[in-house]
From Swiss-Prot:
Residues 1-309 form the RanBD1 domain. Keywords: Nucleus, Phosphoprotein. Its main location: nucleus. InterPro entries: Ran_GTP-bd-rel (IPR008812). It comes from Schizosaccharomyces pombe (strain 972 / ATCC 24843). GO terms for cellular component: cytoplasm; nuclear envelope; nucleus. This is RanBD1 domain-containing protein C584.03c. Residues 522-551 are annotated as: Disordered. Coiled coil: none annotated. It is found in: Nucleus. GO terms for molecular function: GTP binding; GTPase regulator activity. The modification Phosphoserine is found at S441. It holds the Pfam family Ran-binding. Signal peptide: none annotated.
Length: 551
Protein backbone atom coordinates (compact mmCIF):
# COMPACT_ATOMS: atom_id res chain seq x y z
CA UNK A 1 0.00 0.00 0.00
CA UNK A 2 2.26 2.76 -1.27
CA UNK A 3 -0.46 5.38 -0.87
CA UNK A 4 -0.84 4.59 2.82
CA UNK A 5 2.92 4.73 3.33
CA UNK A 6 2.93 8.10 1.60
CA UNK A 7 0.12 9.44 3.76
CA UNK A 8 1.60 8.14 6.99
CA UNK A 9 5.05 9.49 6.13
CA UNK A 10 3.80 13.03 5.55
CA UNK A 11 1.17 13.27 8.26
CA UNK A 12 1.91 14.29 11.83
CA UNK A 13 3.31 10.87 12.58
CA UNK A 14 6.48 9.64 14.19
CA UNK A 15 8.01 6.87 12.10
CA UNK A 16 10.87 4.50 12.82
CA UNK A 17 12.28 1.91 10.46
CA UNK A 18 13.65 -1.40 11.65
CA UNK A 19 16.48 -3.34 10.09
CA UNK A 20 15.48 -6.28 7.92
CA UNK A 21 17.96 -8.82 9.26
CA UNK A 22 20.41 -9.21 12.09
CA UNK A 23 22.71 -6.22 12.28
CA UNK A 24 26.19 -6.15 10.83
CA UNK A 25 27.59 -6.00 14.35
CA UNK A 26 26.01 -9.35 15.20
CA UNK A 27 27.34 -10.92 12.01
CA UNK A 28 30.82 -9.50 12.60
CA UNK A 29 30.98 -10.61 16.22
CA UNK A 30 29.80 -14.08 15.24
CA UNK A 31 32.52 -14.27 12.61
CA UNK A 32 35.21 -13.20 15.08
CA UNK A 33 33.96 -15.75 17.62
CA UNK A 34 34.21 -18.53 15.07
CA UNK A 35 37.73 -17.42 14.14
CA UNK A 36 38.74 -17.43 17.81
CA UNK A 37 37.43 -20.97 18.18
CA UNK A 38 39.26 -22.05 15.06
CA UNK A 39 42.58 -20.52 16.13
CA UNK A 40 42.64 -22.76 19.20
CA UNK A 41 42.91 -25.86 17.01
CA UNK A 42 45.07 -24.34 14.28
CA UNK A 43 48.72 -25.23 13.90
CA UNK A 44 51.18 -23.40 16.14
CA UNK A 45 52.95 -21.81 13.18
CA UNK A 46 49.79 -20.10 11.93
CA UNK A 47 48.19 -19.12 15.22
CA UNK A 48 50.10 -15.85 15.63
CA UNK A 49 49.32 -14.62 12.13
CA UNK A 50 45.68 -15.66 12.41
CA UNK A 51 45.40 -13.85 15.74
CA UNK A 52 46.89 -10.67 14.27
CA UNK A 53 44.54 -10.60 11.28
CA UNK A 54 41.59 -11.43 13.53
CA UNK A 55 42.36 -8.41 15.72
CA UNK A 56 42.50 -6.12 12.68
CA UNK A 57 39.23 -7.53 11.38
CA UNK A 58 37.50 -7.06 14.73
CA UNK A 59 38.63 -3.43 15.04
CA UNK A 60 37.57 -2.65 11.49
CA UNK A 61 34.11 -4.15 12.03
CA UNK A 62 33.68 -2.11 15.20
CA UNK A 63 34.56 1.10 13.35
CA UNK A 64 32.28 0.64 10.34
CA UNK A 65 29.35 -0.93 12.20
CA UNK A 66 27.61 2.36 13.20
CA UNK A 67 27.83 3.72 9.65
CA UNK A 68 26.54 0.50 8.09
CA UNK A 69 23.63 0.25 10.53
CA UNK A 70 22.69 3.88 9.87
CA UNK A 71 22.63 3.20 6.13
CA UNK A 72 20.56 0.04 6.61
CA UNK A 73 17.93 1.84 8.69
CA UNK A 74 17.82 4.93 6.47
CA UNK A 75 17.52 2.83 3.32
CA UNK A 76 14.43 1.13 4.74
CA UNK A 77 12.92 4.63 5.06
CA UNK A 78 12.81 5.02 1.28
CA UNK A 79 15.84 7.32 1.27
CA UNK A 80 16.97 7.49 -2.34
CA UNK A 81 20.48 8.61 -1.39
CA UNK A 82 21.23 5.21 0.11
CA UNK A 83 19.84 2.95 -2.62
CA UNK A 84 23.17 2.38 -4.33
CA UNK A 85 25.11 2.29 -1.07
CA UNK A 86 22.70 -0.32 0.27
CA UNK A 87 23.91 -2.74 -2.39
CA UNK A 88 27.47 -2.33 -1.12
CA UNK A 89 26.33 -2.88 2.46
CA UNK A 90 24.39 -6.01 1.49
CA UNK A 91 27.46 -7.34 -0.31
CA UNK A 92 29.62 -6.82 2.79
CA UNK A 93 26.98 -8.45 4.96
CA UNK A 94 26.83 -11.47 2.65
CA UNK A 95 30.63 -11.76 2.57
CA UNK A 96 30.82 -11.75 6.37
CA UNK A 97 28.11 -14.40 6.67
CA UNK A 98 29.77 -16.56 4.02
CA UNK A 99 33.11 -16.24 5.79
CA UNK A 100 31.47 -17.22 9.10
CA UNK A 101 29.98 -20.36 7.57
CA UNK A 102 33.33 -21.34 6.07
CA UNK A 103 35.15 -20.90 9.37
CA UNK A 104 32.42 -22.82 11.20
CA UNK A 105 32.67 -25.76 8.82
CA UNK A 106 36.46 -25.73 9.04
CA UNK A 107 36.39 -25.67 12.83
CA UNK A 108 34.20 -28.78 12.98
CA UNK A 109 36.01 -30.70 10.27
CA UNK A 110 38.07 -33.69 11.36
CA UNK A 111 41.01 -35.06 9.45
CA UNK A 112 41.78 -38.79 9.45
CA UNK A 113 44.96 -39.76 11.28
CA UNK A 114 47.57 -40.04 8.59
CA UNK A 115 50.81 -38.56 7.46
CA UNK A 116 48.95 -35.98 5.41
CA UNK A 117 47.02 -34.58 8.40
CA UNK A 118 49.46 -31.73 8.99
CA UNK A 119 49.41 -30.86 5.30
CA UNK A 120 45.61 -30.74 5.22
CA UNK A 121 45.50 -28.62 8.37
CA UNK A 122 48.06 -26.27 6.86
CA UNK A 123 45.98 -25.87 3.71
CA UNK A 124 42.87 -25.05 5.73
CA UNK A 125 44.76 -22.50 7.81
CA UNK A 126 46.08 -20.86 4.67
CA UNK A 127 42.59 -20.73 3.17
CA UNK A 128 41.08 -19.16 6.30
CA UNK A 129 43.90 -16.62 6.50
CA UNK A 130 43.48 -15.69 2.85
CA UNK A 131 39.72 -15.19 3.28
CA UNK A 132 40.25 -13.02 6.35
CA UNK A 133 42.67 -10.77 4.47
CA UNK A 134 40.29 -10.56 1.52
CA UNK A 135 37.39 -9.59 3.78
CA UNK A 136 39.55 -7.00 5.53
CA UNK A 137 40.54 -5.53 2.17
CA UNK A 138 36.89 -5.29 1.06
CA UNK A 139 35.94 -3.43 4.23
CA UNK A 140 38.87 -1.03 3.78
CA UNK A 141 37.79 -0.29 0.22
CA UNK A 142 34.18 0.30 1.30
CA UNK A 143 34.97 2.82 4.07
CA UNK A 144 35.50 5.86 1.75
CA UNK A 145 32.30 5.08 -0.14
CA UNK A 146 30.30 4.73 3.07
CA UNK A 147 31.70 8.01 4.35
CA UNK A 148 30.87 9.79 1.09
CA UNK A 149 27.32 8.42 1.06
CA UNK A 150 26.58 9.53 4.62
CA UNK A 151 28.15 12.96 4.07
CA UNK A 152 26.18 13.73 0.91
CA UNK A 153 22.89 12.51 2.40
CA UNK A 154 23.17 14.71 5.49
CA UNK A 155 22.39 11.84 7.84
CA UNK A 156 24.13 11.79 11.18
CA UNK A 157 24.60 9.48 14.13
CA UNK A 158 23.75 11.19 17.38
CA UNK A 159 23.27 9.85 20.87
CA UNK A 160 20.79 12.56 21.81
CA UNK A 161 17.21 11.41 22.25
CA UNK A 162 14.24 13.29 20.80
CA UNK A 163 12.82 16.04 22.98
CA UNK A 164 9.48 14.28 22.95
CA UNK A 165 10.86 11.13 24.59
CA UNK A 166 8.78 10.03 27.55
CA UNK A 167 11.54 8.92 29.88
CA UNK A 168 9.14 7.44 32.43
CA UNK A 169 7.59 5.11 29.84
CA UNK A 170 10.99 4.36 28.31
CA UNK A 171 12.49 3.36 31.66
CA UNK A 172 9.38 1.37 32.50
CA UNK A 173 9.63 -0.55 29.23
CA UNK A 174 13.31 -1.25 29.84
CA UNK A 175 12.48 -2.48 33.36
CA UNK A 176 9.89 -4.93 32.00
CA UNK A 177 12.37 -6.27 29.44
CA UNK A 178 15.13 -6.67 32.02
CA UNK A 179 12.89 -8.57 34.45
CA UNK A 180 11.65 -10.83 31.66
CA UNK A 181 15.19 -11.64 30.53
CA UNK A 182 16.19 -12.52 34.09
CA UNK A 183 13.17 -14.82 34.55
CA UNK A 184 13.36 -16.39 31.07
CA UNK A 185 14.19 -20.10 31.14
CA UNK A 186 14.10 -20.82 27.41
CA UNK A 187 11.44 -23.52 27.54
CA UNK A 188 8.19 -21.59 27.15
CA UNK A 189 7.26 -18.11 25.90
CA UNK A 190 7.44 -15.50 28.66
CA UNK A 191 5.29 -12.39 28.79
CA UNK A 192 7.16 -9.10 28.72
CA UNK A 193 5.37 -6.21 30.37
CA UNK A 194 1.69 -5.75 31.16
CA UNK A 195 -1.41 -6.67 29.21
CA UNK A 196 -2.77 -4.04 26.82
CA UNK A 197 -6.41 -3.65 25.79
CA UNK A 198 -6.63 -2.33 22.26
CA UNK A 199 -8.89 -1.98 19.26
CA UNK A 200 -7.38 -3.08 15.96
CA UNK A 201 -8.07 -2.07 12.38
CA UNK A 202 -7.06 -3.60 9.08
CA UNK A 203 -7.23 -2.49 5.46
CA UNK A 204 -10.08 -3.87 3.40
CA UNK A 205 -8.61 -6.38 0.96
CA UNK A 206 -8.79 -5.68 -2.78
CA UNK A 207 -10.55 -2.37 -2.27
CA UNK A 208 -8.26 -0.66 -4.76
CA UNK A 209 -9.25 -3.12 -7.50
CA UNK A 210 -12.79 -1.83 -7.58
CA UNK A 211 -13.59 0.51 -10.45
CA UNK A 212 -15.95 2.53 -8.28
CA UNK A 213 -13.38 3.45 -5.63
CA UNK A 214 -10.53 5.87 -6.11
CA UNK A 215 -7.08 4.33 -5.98
CA UNK A 216 -5.86 6.95 -3.52
CA UNK A 217 -8.49 6.00 -0.94
CA UNK A 218 -7.43 3.80 1.94
CA UNK A 219 -10.37 2.06 3.56
CA UNK A 220 -10.05 0.65 7.06
CA UNK A 221 -12.14 -1.99 8.75
CA UNK A 222 -12.43 -2.67 12.45
CA UNK A 223 -10.96 -6.11 13.01
CA UNK A 224 -11.01 -6.65 16.79
CA UNK A 225 -13.27 -4.35 18.82
CA UNK A 226 -11.59 -5.57 22.00
CA UNK A 227 -8.11 -7.01 21.63
CA UNK A 228 -5.88 -8.37 24.39
CA UNK A 229 -2.28 -7.62 23.38
CA UNK A 230 0.80 -9.11 25.03
CA UNK A 231 4.48 -9.04 24.26
CA UNK A 232 6.32 -12.38 24.56
CA UNK A 233 9.91 -13.46 24.46
CA UNK A 234 10.04 -16.59 22.34
CA UNK A 235 12.18 -19.68 23.11
CA UNK A 236 14.97 -20.46 20.62
CA UNK A 237 13.57 -23.87 19.68
CA UNK A 238 10.48 -22.23 18.18
CA UNK A 239 12.51 -19.95 15.90
CA UNK A 240 13.52 -20.54 12.32
CA UNK A 241 17.09 -19.29 12.65
CA UNK A 242 19.43 -21.30 14.84
CA UNK A 243 21.66 -18.28 15.48
CA UNK A 244 18.81 -16.27 17.01
CA UNK A 245 18.75 -16.16 20.79
CA UNK A 246 16.73 -13.02 21.49
CA UNK A 247 13.38 -13.01 19.72
CA UNK A 248 10.10 -11.31 20.57
CA UNK A 249 6.56 -11.53 19.25
CA UNK A 250 3.43 -9.43 19.73
CA UNK A 251 0.37 -11.57 20.46
CA UNK A 252 -3.07 -10.19 19.59
CA UNK A 253 -6.18 -12.09 20.68
CA UNK A 254 -9.76 -10.97 20.25
CA UNK A 255 -12.05 -10.85 23.28
CA UNK A 256 -15.78 -11.42 22.86
CA UNK A 257 -16.51 -9.29 25.94
CA UNK A 258 -17.27 -6.31 23.72
CA UNK A 259 -21.06 -6.00 24.22
CA UNK A 260 -21.67 -7.30 20.71
CA UNK A 261 -23.43 -10.33 19.33
CA UNK A 262 -21.26 -13.29 18.32
CA UNK A 263 -22.32 -16.60 16.82
CA UNK A 264 -21.72 -19.74 18.82
CA UNK A 265 -19.45 -21.19 16.14
CA UNK A 266 -17.47 -17.96 15.78
CA UNK A 267 -13.87 -18.21 16.90
CA UNK A 268 -11.82 -15.29 18.23
CA UNK A 269 -9.31 -13.74 15.88
CA UNK A 270 -5.72 -14.41 16.93
CA UNK A 271 -2.59 -12.99 15.41
CA UNK A 272 1.09 -13.27 16.29
CA UNK A 273 3.49 -10.73 14.81
CA UNK A 274 7.18 -11.47 15.11
CA UNK A 275 9.20 -8.31 15.69
CA UNK A 276 11.73 -9.62 13.18
CA UNK A 277 9.04 -9.08 10.54
CA UNK A 278 8.13 -5.52 11.57
CA UNK A 279 9.52 -3.06 9.04
CA UNK A 280 8.15 0.33 10.09
CA UNK A 281 6.35 1.71 13.11
CA UNK A 282 4.23 4.85 12.82
CA UNK A 283 2.98 6.72 15.88
CA UNK A 284 0.14 9.06 14.93
CA UNK A 285 -1.28 11.55 17.38
CA UNK A 286 -4.68 11.23 15.75
CA UNK A 287 -6.25 8.41 13.80
CA UNK A 288 -7.70 10.93 11.36
CA UNK A 289 -4.24 11.59 9.99
CA UNK A 290 -4.14 7.97 8.84
CA UNK A 291 -7.67 8.25 7.40
CA UNK A 292 -9.30 6.57 10.36
CA UNK A 293 -12.12 9.08 10.39
CA UNK A 294 -13.75 7.94 13.63
CA UNK A 295 -10.53 7.76 15.65
CA UNK A 296 -9.25 10.93 17.27
CA UNK A 297 -6.95 9.26 19.80
CA UNK A 298 -3.31 8.21 19.22
CA UNK A 299 -2.78 5.21 16.96
CA UNK A 300 0.13 2.84 16.38
CA UNK A 301 0.50 1.69 12.78
CA UNK A 302 2.67 -1.35 12.06
CA UNK A 303 3.93 -2.42 8.67
CA UNK A 304 5.09 -6.02 8.73
CA UNK A 305 5.62 -9.06 6.54
CA UNK A 306 4.31 -12.57 7.07
CA UNK A 307 7.77 -14.10 7.01
CA UNK A 308 11.30 -13.38 5.91
CA UNK A 309 10.99 -15.02 2.51
CA UNK A 310 7.91 -13.04 1.64
CA UNK A 311 9.57 -9.73 2.32
CA UNK A 312 12.70 -10.58 0.38
CA UNK A 313 10.99 -9.60 -2.83
CA UNK A 314 10.40 -5.94 -3.52
CA UNK A 315 7.00 -6.71 -4.98
CA UNK A 316 5.85 -8.81 -2.05
CA UNK A 317 2.82 -7.31 -0.31
CA UNK A 318 3.11 -5.94 3.21
CA UNK A 319 0.53 -6.11 5.95
CA UNK A 320 -0.75 -3.13 7.87
CA UNK A 321 -2.41 -3.04 11.26
CA UNK A 322 -3.54 -0.05 13.31
CA UNK A 323 -3.69 -0.27 17.11
CA UNK A 324 -5.82 2.06 19.21
CA UNK A 325 -5.77 2.04 23.01
CA UNK A 326 -9.20 1.45 24.50
CA UNK A 327 -10.56 3.77 27.20
CA UNK A 328 -11.55 2.38 30.58
CA UNK A 329 -13.51 -0.73 29.66
CA UNK A 330 -15.05 -3.54 31.66
CA UNK A 331 -13.08 -6.75 31.31
CA UNK A 332 -14.15 -9.73 33.43
CA UNK A 333 -11.62 -11.74 35.36
CA UNK A 334 -11.85 -14.62 32.89
CA UNK A 335 -10.11 -12.50 30.27
CA UNK A 336 -6.97 -12.36 32.35
CA UNK A 337 -4.55 -15.13 33.09
CA UNK A 338 -3.54 -16.41 36.47
CA UNK A 339 -1.52 -14.79 39.21
CA UNK A 340 1.71 -14.53 37.22
CA UNK A 341 0.14 -11.94 34.91
CA UNK A 342 -1.37 -10.12 37.86
CA UNK A 343 2.08 -10.02 39.39
CA UNK A 344 3.42 -8.49 36.22
CA UNK A 345 0.69 -5.84 36.36
CA UNK A 346 1.87 -4.64 39.77
CA UNK A 347 3.51 -1.27 39.40
CA UNK A 348 7.03 -0.62 40.60
CA UNK A 349 5.75 1.66 43.37
CA UNK A 350 3.43 -1.09 44.66
CA UNK A 351 6.24 -3.65 44.65
CA UNK A 352 8.56 -1.31 46.56
CA UNK A 353 5.86 -0.49 49.12
CA UNK A 354 5.07 -4.17 49.67
CA UNK A 355 8.75 -4.97 50.07
CA UNK A 356 9.11 -2.33 52.78
CA UNK A 357 6.08 -3.73 54.57
CA UNK A 358 7.49 -7.25 54.43
CA UNK A 359 4.57 -8.62 52.40
CA UNK A 360 5.38 -11.31 49.89
CA UNK A 361 4.44 -10.77 46.30
CA UNK A 362 2.39 -13.97 46.11
CA UNK A 363 0.25 -12.91 49.07
CA UNK A 364 -0.39 -9.54 47.48
CA UNK A 365 -1.33 -11.21 44.23
CA UNK A 366 -3.83 -13.46 46.01
CA UNK A 367 -5.45 -10.48 47.72
CA UNK A 368 -5.45 -8.53 44.49
CA UNK A 369 -7.06 -11.40 42.62
CA UNK A 370 -9.86 -11.82 45.14
CA UNK A 371 -10.77 -8.14 45.09
CA UNK A 372 -10.03 -7.44 41.44
CA UNK A 373 -12.63 -4.97 40.10
CA UNK A 374 -14.55 -5.46 36.93
CA UNK A 375 -13.23 -2.18 35.55
CA UNK A 376 -9.51 -1.95 35.01
CA UNK A 377 -8.07 1.40 36.03
CA UNK A 378 -4.73 2.91 35.19
CA UNK A 379 -4.32 0.82 32.10
CA UNK A 380 -0.93 0.90 30.35
CA UNK A 381 -0.99 3.52 27.62
CA UNK A 382 -0.03 3.21 23.99
CA UNK A 383 3.31 4.94 24.51
CA UNK A 384 4.49 2.11 26.76
CA UNK A 385 3.59 -0.44 24.08
CA UNK A 386 5.44 1.65 21.51
CA UNK A 387 8.64 1.67 23.56
CA UNK A 388 8.32 -2.05 24.25
CA UNK A 389 8.16 -2.71 20.52
CA UNK A 390 11.10 -0.43 19.80
CA UNK A 391 13.40 -1.87 22.47
CA UNK A 392 12.43 -5.49 21.83
CA UNK A 393 12.97 -5.01 18.09
CA UNK A 394 16.38 -3.52 18.82
CA UNK A 395 17.37 -6.52 20.95
CA UNK A 396 16.06 -8.91 18.31
CA UNK A 397 18.08 -7.18 15.60
CA UNK A 398 21.36 -6.82 17.47
CA UNK A 399 21.01 -10.04 19.50
CA UNK A 400 22.25 -8.16 22.55
CA UNK A 401 20.63 -6.71 25.62
CA UNK A 402 19.68 -3.05 25.46
CA UNK A 403 21.83 -2.46 28.53
CA UNK A 404 24.92 -3.45 26.53
CA UNK A 405 24.26 -1.30 23.46
CA UNK A 406 25.79 2.15 22.86
CA UNK A 407 23.68 5.29 23.02
CA UNK A 408 23.92 5.96 19.28
CA UNK A 409 22.44 2.58 18.40
CA UNK A 410 19.55 2.99 20.83
CA UNK A 411 18.86 6.51 19.57
CA UNK A 412 18.44 5.22 16.01
CA UNK A 413 15.47 3.13 17.12
CA UNK A 414 13.89 5.97 19.09
CA UNK A 415 14.13 8.71 16.46
CA UNK A 416 11.94 9.64 13.56
CA UNK A 417 13.80 8.85 10.34
CA UNK A 418 12.67 12.20 8.87
CA UNK A 419 13.90 14.20 11.84
CA UNK A 420 10.49 15.36 13.06
CA UNK A 421 9.38 15.99 16.60
CA UNK A 422 6.06 15.32 18.26
CA UNK A 423 4.47 16.71 21.42
CA UNK A 424 5.39 14.72 24.50
CA UNK A 425 1.79 14.66 25.70
CA UNK A 426 -0.57 13.30 23.01
CA UNK A 427 -3.54 14.87 24.83
CA UNK A 428 -2.18 18.33 24.05
CA UNK A 429 -2.32 17.72 20.32
CA UNK A 430 -4.94 19.68 18.39
CA UNK A 431 -5.50 18.62 14.81
CA UNK A 432 -6.86 21.17 12.38
CA UNK A 433 -10.43 20.56 11.32
CA UNK A 434 -11.30 19.22 7.93
CA UNK A 435 -12.04 21.90 5.37
CA UNK A 436 -13.43 21.13 1.95
CA UNK A 437 -11.46 23.95 0.31
CA UNK A 438 -8.14 22.62 1.60
CA UNK A 439 -6.03 20.57 -0.75
CA UNK A 440 -3.85 17.63 0.10
CA UNK A 441 -0.68 18.14 2.08
CA UNK A 442 2.62 18.19 0.18
CA UNK A 443 3.85 14.76 -0.73
CA UNK A 444 0.64 12.99 0.13
CA UNK A 445 -1.86 11.51 -2.26
CA UNK A 446 -4.63 13.63 -3.69
CA UNK A 447 -7.29 14.80 -1.33
CA UNK A 448 -10.56 13.01 -0.87
CA UNK A 449 -13.50 13.27 1.46
CA UNK A 450 -11.78 10.77 3.73
CA UNK A 451 -8.34 12.39 3.68
CA UNK A 452 -8.87 16.15 3.62
CA UNK A 453 -7.23 16.65 6.99
CA UNK A 454 -4.29 18.94 7.60
CA UNK A 455 -1.77 17.88 10.20
CA UNK A 456 -0.45 20.39 12.65
CA UNK A 457 3.25 21.03 11.98
CA UNK A 458 5.12 19.01 14.56
CA UNK A 459 7.76 21.69 15.08
CA UNK A 460 5.15 24.05 16.54
CA UNK A 461 4.32 24.05 20.19
CA UNK A 462 0.91 22.42 20.74
CA UNK A 463 -0.10 25.30 23.01
CA UNK A 464 0.45 27.92 20.28
CA UNK A 465 -1.50 26.41 17.41
CA UNK A 466 -5.06 27.01 18.53
CA UNK A 467 -5.26 30.52 17.10
CA UNK A 468 -3.49 29.81 13.82
CA UNK A 469 -5.90 30.87 11.04
CA UNK A 470 -6.81 28.29 8.47
CA UNK A 471 -5.86 29.65 5.05
CA UNK A 472 -5.78 27.92 1.72
CA UNK A 473 -2.43 27.36 0.02
CA UNK A 474 -3.42 29.88 -2.67
CA UNK A 475 -4.08 32.63 -0.12
CA UNK A 476 -0.89 31.83 1.76
CA UNK A 477 1.15 31.98 -1.45
CA UNK A 478 -0.49 35.26 -2.45
CA UNK A 479 0.21 36.84 0.93
CA UNK A 480 3.83 35.73 0.84
CA UNK A 481 4.22 37.10 -2.66
CA UNK A 482 2.84 40.51 -1.64
CA UNK A 483 5.20 40.72 1.32
CA UNK A 484 8.17 39.81 -0.87
CA UNK A 485 7.20 42.47 -3.42
CA UNK A 486 6.95 45.13 -0.72
CA UNK A 487 10.36 44.18 0.67
CA UNK A 488 11.92 44.26 -2.79
CA UNK A 489 10.42 47.69 -3.54
CA UNK A 490 11.73 49.06 -0.27
CA UNK A 491 15.26 47.78 -0.95
CA UNK A 492 15.32 49.34 -4.43
CA UNK A 493 14.09 52.72 -3.21
CA UNK A 494 16.35 55.71 -2.51
CA UNK A 495 18.14 55.97 0.85
CA UNK A 496 15.88 58.80 1.97
CA UNK A 497 12.76 56.79 1.24
CA UNK A 498 14.13 53.76 3.04
CA UNK A 499 15.06 55.91 6.01
CA UNK A 500 11.60 57.43 6.24
CA UNK A 501 10.00 54.01 6.06
CA UNK A 502 12.28 52.48 8.62
CA UNK A 503 12.09 55.32 11.18
CA UNK A 504 9.35 54.94 13.79
CA UNK A 505 6.32 57.14 13.32
CA UNK A 506 6.25 60.16 15.60
CA UNK A 507 3.57 60.12 18.24
CA UNK A 508 0.73 62.59 17.57
CA UNK A 509 0.16 63.14 21.27
CA UNK A 510 2.94 65.60 22.18
CA UNK A 511 3.38 69.21 23.15
CA UNK A 512 2.89 70.29 19.52
CA UNK A 513 -0.04 67.98 18.94
CA UNK A 514 -2.54 70.85 18.63
CA UNK A 515 -0.51 72.54 15.90
CA UNK A 516 -0.04 69.25 14.04
CA UNK A 517 -3.72 68.49 14.24
CA UNK A 518 -4.51 71.92 12.88
CA UNK A 519 -2.03 71.57 10.01
CA UNK A 520 -3.13 68.00 9.24
CA UNK A 521 -6.88 67.82 9.77
CA UNK A 522 -7.09 64.64 7.68
CA UNK A 523 -5.67 62.56 10.54
CA UNK A 524 -8.55 63.53 12.82
CA UNK A 525 -11.39 61.01 12.63
CA UNK A 526 -14.78 62.30 11.65
CA UNK A 527 -16.80 63.30 14.72
CA UNK A 528 -19.60 65.56 15.79
CA UNK A 529 -18.97 69.34 15.35
CA UNK A 530 -17.79 71.01 18.54
CA UNK A 531 -19.73 73.83 20.13
CA UNK A 532 -18.72 77.44 19.42
CA UNK A 533 -17.58 78.04 23.01
CA UNK A 534 -15.14 75.13 22.92
CA UNK A 535 -13.74 76.36 19.60
CA UNK A 536 -13.20 79.88 21.02
CA UNK A 537 -11.45 78.48 24.10
CA UNK A 538 -9.19 76.35 21.95
CA UNK A 539 -8.31 79.35 19.75
CA UNK A 540 -7.50 81.45 22.83
CA UNK A 541 -5.14 78.80 24.13
CA UNK A 542 -3.36 78.73 20.78
CA UNK A 543 -2.85 82.50 20.85
CA UNK A 544 -1.44 82.35 24.39
CA UNK A 545 1.06 79.66 23.39
CA UNK A 546 2.21 81.70 20.37
CA UNK A 547 2.77 84.82 22.52
CA UNK A 548 4.89 82.81 24.95
CA UNK A 549 7.07 81.50 22.15
CA UNK A 550 7.42 84.92 20.43
CA UNK A 551 7.37 87.61 23.16
Amino acid sequence: MDELLNVASHAATFATNFALKHSISFAGKLAVQQVSSYIKRASADDQSELESVKTQLLEMIRVVTPAIELIEIMSVGENENFKSTKQLVDSLHADIEQFTKHVLSAAHSEFPPSSEKETLQKNVDTSILREMKTLLLKINDAVPLLNLSITTSGASISSSLPKSTSFSQLLRANSYIYRANVAFTGNEPLQVGPTFFLRTYKIIDNHAKSGYISNDLVMWKEEMPVCIAKMFRMPPQRLKSKDTVLAYALSLKQSFDDDRYHDEDETPVTKTISLNDVRTLFFSLSGKLLRLDDVQTPVLLLKYADDETEYSSNTAPSNWIALEALPLVSIPNESLDESDELAESLSDSEAARLQLLGIKKQESVAKKKSSFPSTIKDQPNLTLLEYLIRLCALESTTQESVLQLPDEQIALYLKDYQGRERPRDPASYNALENRSELSASPGSVSSSRHSGIFATPTFLSPWNIKNIPLVTPEVSTRQTKNVDEEDSALLMASPSVRKSNLLPQEDLISKDSVIKLKENPSVIPHSEPESSSKVINCQAKLNVEKEKKNP
